[in-house]
């Protein structure tokens, strides 16, 4: 299972979801879907924008866990 740790990174960066959505160029609703793990996928361009906005690596946002 893939776990999305956007909330963890937001807390570390003291950034709001709305601010992140604006920086990345996605809607707050789409960011919410991603944060809750309900997204079926994520574009590399979105992942890249998330990493740039949060000053992190993809592995800081996405984590694989055995079921």
What are these regions, as identified by a protein language model?
Residues 1-15:
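A short, Lys/Arg-rich alpha-helix, primarily the initiator
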Residues 8, 28, 33, 40, ...:
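Short, charged recognition helix plus adjacent turn
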Residues 15-33:
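Short alpha-helical DNA-recognition segment
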Residues 10, 21, 51:
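The alpha-helix within a helix-turn-helix
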